[in-house]
Structure formats: structure tokens, C-alpha cells
Amino acid sequence: MSRPRRRGRDIHGVLLLDKPQGLSSNDALQKVKRLYNANRAGHTGALDPLATGMLPICLGEATKFSQFLLDSDKRYRVIARLGQRTDTSDADGQIVQERPVSFTQAQLDAALDSFRGDIKQVPSMYSALKYQGKKLYEYARQGIEVPREARSITVYELQFIRWEGDELELEIHCSKGTYIRTITDDLGELLGCGAHVIYLRRLQVATYPTERMVTLEQLNELLEQAHRQEIAPAELLDPLLMPMDSPVENYPEVNLLPVVAGYVKQGQPVQVAGAPASGMVRITEGEERKFIGVGDIADDGRVAPRRLVVEYFD
């Protein structure tokens, strides 16, 4: 007879994990899920195993709003190795070409400027994007290259940090869907020497504060502390979570009377005085401004529910 699956906790919020190098985003997610004994968990945009930094992990009902973080801006610090190109565009791949580094600072400045603003980017074959239902990296590992369409991205800021010998360090603030490995590879080709990523750290996702990031080591230490003090781990771990509505905190708020919120919870659009004319809104209920979900402004001006928090249904 199979053993019944142990039920986890109904815990809701967002943990800003500082992902360590060498760990996949999914492995990091599973570790956090176990530490919190959470029923549900999901991350908001994978980091390569080589990369470190901010990986927001949504727990419970917060998973419904993870897409809004996938769509948000990101900020990275990257160090590129000049003179070498790899098949994956990072240090985890095989070197496929070596060339001398012979450009000038003026040439570097001009090359960097071409990557600022609205640009087109062809995703790497070593990415999780799909072609005919199969991930690109699965083709790449079989030595197969498939067509990829250039995608529109925005590089809001590309800051030169340092250039020492064969190392180039940059800070990049970019839109969703930007591959830093691809920017590095394309820059290396433009400079005529090739380049690949040897260090990558995600500094920020959306407007989340970097000082709220926590490591797996810190989480395990708190778990051990809870055991020593004979208290529930939740007492030490749960205060680290950002609110479940933090992925949508920048959307305009529409506050509803409880009786009106009742219609929204049943999936019905409602007319709200003073609501924005269009776009997404964050819906709250009553004087306590309890978060109940997000909605769209319909063509007729009503607030139509889009994603709702089930646990608040009566």
C-alpha cells in the first residue's frame, strides 16, 4: 500500500532567495518549498546554474501572480571573458573559438552604445524557449540548430564598470525576455574577439529591495535555531516573506465595499467610481484593504476579475 502524501502548509507570500552558484532554479525552488513545508511553490524566471542572485519564489496563492514578475524588468551584473567564444555563451560550455583582444576603448564604447535602447535579440539555442513543442536546449544538446525569430527587448541602462585584460564587467537593466548570455556573445562578435559569461548575478527583479534577499544557508540556520528553541519554524521563516500581492504592488488599487467584492469573487465585473480608464488593477476589500486579486478594466469601464485569491472566498 502506498503511503499517503504528506500535506504541506497553506503559506502565502514571496521569498527573495539569493540563489547560489551551481544550483538550478528548480532545485532552489524545491529546497525552499521543503524548508517552508509549503503546499505550492513556483519561481518567477529561471537563473542559469552559473548565475547567482535574486530569485523570487512564490508560495501558495502568490503563485497566481508569478507571471507579473516574469514580465518585470531585471538588473544584472555580468563579467565577460574576452577572446573566447563558447557553445553556450557562458563558462559552462565548450570553447569553440579563440581570437585576440585588439579593440580600443573608443571601439568598446561605440559597441556598447549599440546595445542600449530598443533592440532585437535572437535567443540562444541554449535556452528554455520552445520550438515545435521542444525546448531549444534539447535540440542544442543533440547538435541541432533550429530557426529562432529575433525578439524585441529593451536595454534601459548598460553601464560600463571595468575592462582589465580579458575581463569586461557591465551592469545591465533590461526588459523581460533579455538573455544576458546573448548580449555578451553578440558584443564579443561585434568587437571581433568573441566573449562569454564567466560571472552573472541578478541584482534586482522589479522593485524588490535587494536587502530583503536571503540565502539557503540563512534559511537552514533559522530552521536549526527553531529546533533548538523548540518553536515552530514558521515563527522565524514566515517573517522573511514579502506580501502575496507584492508582484502587483505597482498596479493602481481599486478598493471595494464587501458587498461589491462579493460580486467580484463570483467572477462578475463591477462598476467602480474613480477606477482607472484602462489597464490592470489590484483589487482590495473593505477598510482593511484586504487583497483579493487583480482585474482588468473592461471596455465598458467596469472592473473585471482576472486572478482571485481563493483562500479569501467565503
UniProtKB/Swiss-Prot annotation:
Stretches assigned to coiled coil: none
E.C. numbers: 5.4.99.25
Known Pfam families for this protein?
TruB-C_2, TruB_C_2, TruB_N
Q: Which domain of life is it from?
A: Bacteria
What keywords are annotated for this sequence in UniProt? Isomerase, tRNA processing
The UniProt annotation places substrate binding at: H43, Y76, Y179, L200
Family listed = Belongs to the pseudouridine synthase TruB family. Type 1 subfamily.
**How is this protein named in the record?**
tRNA pseudouridine synthase B
Underlying gene: truB
